Amino acid sequence: MAKKRANGEGNIRKRADGRWEGRYTAGYHPETGKRIIKNVLGKTQAECKAKLSAAMEATRGIDVSRADEYTVATWLRSWYEIYAKPNIRISTANRYQLMVEQYTIPRIGSIKLTKLTAHDLQKLYKDLMENGRIDRKSGHGNPGLSSTTVRSLHLMLHSALERAVKERLILRNPTEDCIAPKVQKIEMQILPPEHIKDYLEAADRRGLLPMFYLELVTGLRKGEITALLWSDLDTLNKTISVSKQYVKNPNGELTLSRPKTETSVRKISIPQDAIDLLITEHSKHPENPYMFPSPATGEMYYPDSVVNLHKKILKDAGLPHIRFHDLRHTFATLALQNGVDVKTVSSMLGHYDAGFTLRTYTHATRQKQDEAAQTMGSFMARVM
């Protein structure tokens, strides 16, 4: 007969097959009120007792009736739809969906949520770093995801599992015990001032001077410059309005959304030369609403197509490779080095904080600090 454990901690009995079984109340069904009974097995009474104690500790404070419903896959999908998607930007939601459906669920989705461990997650990170890429050319390049992408996935999982803790589905967030990969910082590059003329001449030969001239005097993100409409240009006040961007969802489709942050919705002053170029560009397609429609389709450029055009311009000009995003860095660096204050540059870039701009472009402000030091040194020499 069953042996009652002390303090109501469960029952242990020896089964007919010789093994020991421990049974305990894990919770109560929310509708029927009936006890939810679970069990553990052991070869010896001591082993069974230890397993029973561990199992009861693991369920203490957990809503077992709900926790048992979830695997990693079902919880991540539920969290994404209910908590994440309604409260984040479209581009972030698209990235989360990709990380949930393509990177995480195929590898650990079948694990019960209550059984997920830090070890499972650490193995996931390792596998993604080594074999995580979905679309890659056979035999070429690194098949793994970047440390930046895997760290982003770690942060997403931390958020999802933290919600599971608050919902009393798991006792502790297993990401707390993980070692997230260190981000390998990409060295910032710019288009040197002595290369700008060659670059723009190459762009002009391809009929792309207005777009890439505007990029160099504004530092727009690729999704922002492709989403510009002719109506975004104010020729009287010499500004362009940035209020939208095109981003790619996990299915490869383009989606129009608000820019990266609220501070990314902005008006940017542009020089008269840029306005003149834009007016000339618009005269080629006066009925088209887009600032830079694709000659092939008449629709807006696919953002990655603009990146490819940038690569062709560099090749035409015989210039070393830099990323399209480095044109944004070029604008910021040259503006700061030529005396534009950091707050103005920050607002033009759409950064949430001038401090972020300052930290990002320390190399540019260092030159101005050196000049300031020399100025003050000369002043002090005169007065002493």
Language model regions located:
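Short, conserved phosphate-binding/catalytic loop or strand-edge motifs used
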Residues: 114-129, 176-181
